[in-house]
């Protein structure tokens, strides 16, 4: 069974093809480095380490958050964390107004005291409004591809979002994928953008 199918079977995650190719390389590098058979638990740990912030990592196969399972083997997880978000319509109803509270650990993660930031933006939907909001403090990101799906059925269903972002100015931009998981499809989308931004800064 391929890696994509194993993630879909065990964790209800249906990765887009280009994300699948990217993650396959991460798993292959792990296999080449460790010289060991890659088990299902290794795949999930690698996926969490690479794409999911601490608060998203403690999930069952059904996508239910069961607590923080982040451990010392996982890398410190990036600059930004989404604390709260609210979305409303503009005065004429044509635009989306988004307000968010973020925890900003600074560009040099670990070297600065985290700061809570209130940001707001306007766009033709929550994603565009969020990109507008974070651009106000120096984060330049644009969407190249986006996919989403529910992970289960019922009132407690979780949603998964996958986004391919260009992060940074044109001459120094990186193309990276991000993943977000949440009970709200809007919040999962915003978490996927943060995942991509954090990954871009971890890779520098």
Which residue stretches match the model-derived regions?
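Terminal or standalone catalytic/regulatory effector modules within metabolic enzymes
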Residues: 4-204
């Amino acid at each position: 069974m391929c890696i994509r199918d194993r993630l879909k079977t065990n964790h209800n995650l249906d990765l887009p093809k280009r994300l699948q190719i990217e993650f396959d390389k991460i798993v292959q590098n792990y296999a080449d480095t460790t010289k060991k058979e890659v088990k299902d638990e290794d795949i999930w740990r690698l996926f969490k380490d690479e794409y999911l912030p601490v608060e998203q990592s403690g999930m069952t196969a059904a996508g239910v958050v069961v607590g923080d399972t982040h451990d010392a083997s996982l890398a410190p997880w990036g600059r930004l964390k989404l604390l709260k978000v609210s979305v409303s319509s503009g005065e004429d109803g044509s635009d989306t107004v988004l307000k968010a509270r973020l925890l900003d650990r600074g560009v040099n993660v670990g070297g600065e005291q985290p700061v809570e930031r209130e940001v707001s933006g306007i766009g033709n939907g929550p994603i565009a409004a969020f990109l507008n909001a974070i651009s106000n403090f120096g984060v330049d990101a644009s969407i190249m591809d986006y996919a989403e799906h529910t992970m289960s059925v019922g009132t407690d269903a979780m949603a998964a979002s996958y986004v391919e972002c260009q992060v940074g100015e044109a001459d120094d931009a990186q193309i990276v994928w991000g993943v977000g998981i949440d009970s709200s499809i809007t919040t999962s989308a915003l978490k996927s953008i943060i995942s991509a931004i954090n990954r871009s800064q971890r890779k520098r």
